[in-house]
Amino acid sequence: MRRIILISYLICLILLVSSKAYCQIHIKFQIGGQEKEVIPRVESVVMQNDSVISFSTFNTSNTELTIPAKGAYKISLSAHNYQPWESNLNLRNDTVINVIMQKSPIALQEVVVKGTKTPTVTATGETFYLSSKARKEKDPFKALSEIPVLKVNPISQSITTRDGSSPLILIDGRLVNSGINPILPADIESVTVEDVVSARYLDQDINKIINIHLRKERPLYVYFEERTRHDIPLRKGFVGSNFEIGRSHFAVYGSVFYNYLTKDRIDYETLEKRNDQQKQLIGSNISRKNDFDLKLLFKYEPNARNYFAWNISNRISNMHKSATYNGEYLNNNISNKMIANDHTKDKSNGWLGSFFYEHTFKDKSSLDVYSYFNHAKANRRQQYAEHIISDLIPTFLSLDNIRNQVGLDVDYNGVRHKYGQIEAGNHFLYTHDNLWDNVFSPSVLTHVSQSSNYSYISYSKVWKKIMLMTSVGLQGLFVKVDSRSDSYWRPKMSVAIGFRVSKSQTARLSYTLNNILPSPQQLVPVSSSVNPWQKVEGNMNLRPIQTHDLALTYDIKILDWLRLQTFAKHKITTNMIESFLRKENNYVIQSYRNNGCYNRWNTGFGLSINSNSVQAYLSPALSWEHYEGGNRLSSWGLNGNLTWWALDQMAIQVEAEWKNKSYSAISITKYSNPMSANISMAWYPTDNIQISAGITYLGGIREQITTIDTPNYYQRQKMSFHSESFRPWILFAYTIRKHNKLRIENKMPYFDMDR
């Protein structure tokens, strides 16, 4: 009896397995290129009802795929340098599918590039293509470090251009706020570095752009990153996480970070003179600060033509400063001992909510709509007291600020035609600040409202070796401070002409016209200083400034690994807003005024070295400045960096920057040693782990001296940054990127909550 039961059980089990195997569908792919070339690596994704059933990789010896059961499926194939292949199939039986994959053309500035790694020169910049070695990297910053016109720090995850500017990062031409961290280098088609921006970005005070073009496949993906960095001993650090998870049509991105600063010491030596009085103080300022940043982004792409995104961000910041100074007070040559104490508390809390929609038309042109609302609160409490003999001279500062800001941007992006490319749009921004001065009773309330409405149109075209981009706009500026109202209409313009002298030489001439409103702090007639001798006040009569930037650059590719760029720039600022001093009763008032023209000339060169394991950059520059009614002021600067990759798993990076002087309309600052001198090392034991260590500032104790010298007032202040000088630190990061090629692109525009 037992034998019969056992045999019956085995027969049922065999039948069950057989039926299961019988229900499976086997698909054999015969994959090749248009020229019958063999494609060595093809990735496949099988989806059913928006769920991923299978994700696998084919090679020349394995092109078979197994489907669990009969039904309707969506099958996608992708390969490097080939256009993706997709098909919706209703599978009932085993089948053989022949697939011919077409190579991907990349159209940029009317230049179509197929299968080439040679950089493409445009009217506004240059487009680069990552090497096969860079595409195999897991860290996008490590991959981007091979671009010769960028200075990339994979340890701090930062990117700057050759002149030290922090560029705006775009993904496929769209502003983003989640950065490039989730990107897998294999998904990067090209990287465009734009030195001249169109009128669309002028109202955002953007002058450099990095545009990263991605492949179009969008599989199921998961991205998670944990990062923590700390000085030794503890002074400055952070801990936080980034994550992104989603399917082919919906995704959620989040970021949570805590930043801190503690026991940060800065030493001061201050000398002040006024009439027959003199103060000389020496002491230290100890700071501590805590920041909390939260970001959530929801992305929804119902189809290839429509994209939606919702974002919410919160930033909370608290800072405390405490200082004690000792010295002497001199009045009519009579000296007395003096002690001063300073205590400051700053708090801020800002929220940002935004919505973004993009619609793509049949001809691949697109319409973008971006709306946002920002609400922020900030307050400062400061108490300063001077003790001279038995006298106590206290000064208080108590300011509260509430800001509400709303914006709406509408942009049309045309496609490239034989006659060129056209873009147009309108940007509206309204900002309202309520500022309370609580020192008085009752509190004094000041209202500041600023509006900007900006319309523009851009045109670009390429004629063989000549490339043109021209962009013009009209901006309406409206300012109201309490009962005073002003309105202005100003033009905006951006023009760039590029000329390809030869395959290795390019010249570019550019001109930019822009307008900048005064900040609310420059407009409010409320003192923001606790110095008993000096007040700092705004001026509600300020007008917008206008800037004219003219630049000429000449790029030479000397060798495959060696590039030289020479540049000459001239900036003219009319209605220049500058600081000035005036005497009023027993006070020296520092305020702001529109004072004619400001001119700045800048010239220099940059030398880039980019070999297999070494990236280096060195750039000296000379500058001349001229304020209205003043003398011509000169300065020089030098910045450089060196990155050496050892065995592809370890990087050593050195960064340094020198500058001898900087100027304002009333002061001069001298730097006695380098402004920065850092060394760091990163080790990647696995694709998921990064361990880094370094030393901040190797140039001794960083110091600077600022001097104000006028007939009515003299001040000399020396600052020594003890805590940040020669400070070791350590960083640990753990990153997971799974099936990143199916990620939804993040097109939500970036919003700076500090602007």
PLM ranges: what are they?
Residues 34, 42-47, 78-80, 96-133, ...:
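Short, acidic, small-residue-rich periplasmic hinge/interaction motif at the N-terminus
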Residues 96-100, 110, 140-143, 158-159, ...:
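N-terminal periplasmic accessory domains that precede
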Residues 203-210, 217-266, 289-292:
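Outer-membrane beta-barrel translocator/receptor signature
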Residues 227-232, 247, 258-262, 314-320, ...:
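Transmembrane beta-strands of outer-membrane beta-barrel pores
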Residues 293-319, 341-484, 488-494, 500-504, ...:
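Face-selective signature of the C-terminal outer-membrane beta-barrel domain
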Residues 515-565, 572, 590-602, 719, ...:
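Outer-membrane beta-barrel signature, preferentially recognizing the C-terminal barrel domain
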